[in-house]
Amino acid sequence: MAPAPVTLLAPGAASSMSCSQPGQRSPSNDFQVLRGTELQHLLHAVVPGPWQEDVADAEECAGRCGPLMDCWAFHYNVSSHGCQLLPWTQHSPHSRLWHSGRCDLFQEKGEWGYMPTLRNGLEENFCRNPDGDPGGPWCHTTDPAVRFQSCSIKSCRVAACVWCNGEEYRGAVDRTESGRECQRWDLQHPHQHPFEPGKFLDQGLDDNYCRNPDGSERPWCYTTDPQIEREFCDLPRCGSEAQPRQEATSVSCFRGKGEGYRGTANTTTAAYLASVGTRKSHISTDLRQKNTRASEVGGGAGVGTCCCGDLRENFCWNLDGSEAPWCFTLRPGTRVGFCYQIRRCTDDVRPQDCYHGAGEQYRGTVSKTRKGVQCQRWSAETPHKLQALTLGRHALMSGTRAWKWLRLPCHDFAPAPASVHIYLRTACTTGGELLPDPDGDSHGPWCYTMDPRTPFDYCALRRCDQVQFEKCGKRVDRLDQRRSKLRVAGGHPGNSPWTVSLRNRQGQHFCAGSLVKEQWILTARQCFSSCHMPLTGYEVWLGTLFQNPQHGEPGLQRVPVAKMLCGPSGSQLVLLKLERSVTLNQRVALICLPPEWYVVPPGTKCEIAGWGETKGTGNDTVLNVALLNVISNQECNIKHRGHVRESEMCTEGLLAPVGACEGDYGGPLACFTHNCWVLKGIRIPNRVCTRSRWPAVFTRVSVFVDWIHKVMRLG
């Protein structure tokens, strides 16, 4: 039997139950939202209510739908601010979800309103308990006379709990310890806050559920009570031990970055004694990512045990993915110290511990010599006083502690006026001795040592093997690439068989990408609104030079996108997995991935490609190709005022407007190396498109190539 038609409110009647005023509970708290989604009923005899165009926002729609017994969901048109009330949900018979570019779907949280997400386990038709029913897991039945029924699964009598401080909690608890209802994260009343879901994409800020986006003691939320800003939620911890870890542990040496080290070393390299761990109530911003409850430095607190991070006693451990084991110290003014004196396990051989050429571009984290002696910090003056090296474009200055990296004005220790390149720490901000080769020594990277009897020595690095590329990075150039001014702004006709076109649900090109494996595309994070957005209807087009190829064009391959995985923090990368592998041929080819941490030498000519805006310089309906010279980050930061990071790279800004524009983002910066084209950069948005003499910025792929390989390996 078809559901009864929706009863509509007269426009004037909506005011008594429409959008909430500041200090009141929002009616949208009763709904869960699916962005970019419409709900359709397959029976023509069943029709939704008419569109109401007199609503202020989605809250007012919720206020109209909530009191009606026959309204279970509504569409909200984000463009026209229209509202359509619905007498069914996605769980009703003969209904289906349809991805849309104009509407958001709001469904009641009641018995019908449980939306499957990547984390809540609502899969297929399995028994679940999304509403915490005391009877245990249940499901909707296929019997028209029985709406839902318990699955009679025996209870284990284990309460819902959170590990550690609950930063990974993604459940559906939406009330605080005192019973107050939580405020929606996407609303700014009754309490204003900085945790907008669109800015904290990895924190699971769904609807009004309890979360812990700031590393607090446990999950919490803003309340709907205007007098009480925020409260913790009633979620107990899962026992007294920390969440189980998967790393292989060692007690006498460490592997990798030392995440699995559980030894008893309690002094730093500089012999500062580690402080005993005690709990603190708030984590300072600069140490938030350490996810610890460690002691305040210099305090005389007694011994304590920390849940988040398993900090027992005062040992050097690495619980946050830093470059090596570390601890908080008792030395005033030195908050954190690294314990580099702990030896590395003999079976720990890291492929990235190698250098190319003479090692001038090495930016790894090795900090010991070939004899195992710890390197002296470049900023230190003991046991060896560093000598000034003025060698061509580079300089390593001593006699001051005002060390800088990048091309910045020198301080009082340099001849005025002056601006020199200063090498210091170039890959991370947590400390350590990164080892460049500032004087071009042909024997490789070196450092001053902590041994007073040995001024310097070469580092425990090997020369990287010759890079071997097999079936990637090969192409047959089909078009003349000499002088014709078409394509990318200032570009020319070209062939880039690994450059793909990303298409939205309407089949429109919106970004470029690179084919790095038969079933994997690498592109820019900024091409997508969220890391968890619905991908139904999104496709990748390959094998064509044209932005709008003719129907039946030979060689064109259209493959749906199956899933999306966002890269590490700060990478601005996304990997897209396709529903099936593509067919490789002359029109479709893989581009090679670079070695880890490889730095492209300045002056290298590389190629960008895409179908984006040409700014009037040519035809933007075909593939855009242009050649650009790579420049050093030091030179790039002169224009970008020091904002270019080590995980990014630049190409020079030319007098003519040549570069990538809207629609080219996510596309490759390909360099010809070892007779193959290698993916060195991914184009990310800049403030302007092809600004004259303005360097373009790319994500440096070699920094994140280990993550790329891991994702593709695990699928």
Curated annotation (Swiss-Prot):
Disulfide bonds join C127-C151, C161-C238, C182-C221, C210-C233, C253-C345, C316-C339, C354-C464, C375-C447, C511-C527, C606-C671, C636-C650, C661-C689. InterPro entries: HGF/MST1, Kringle, Kringle-like, Kringle_CS, Kringle_sf, Pan_app, Peptidase_S1_PA, Peptidase_S1_PA_chymotrypsin. Residues 63-156, 160-238, 252-345, 353-464 form the Kringle domain. Keywords: Disulfide bond, Hydrolase, Kringle, Protease, Repeat, Secreted, Serine protease homolog, Signal. Residues 1-20 form the signal peptide. It holds the Pfam family Kringle. Residues 488-713 form the Peptidase S1 domain. GO terms for molecular function: peptidase activity; receptor tyrosine kinase binding. GO terms for biological process: proteolysis; regulation of receptor signaling pathway via JAK-STAT. It comes from the Eukaryota. GO terms for cellular component: extracellular space. It is found in: Secreted. Residues 21-110 form the PAN domain. Belongs to the peptidase S1 family. Plasminogen subfamily. This is Putative macrophage stimulating 1-like protein.
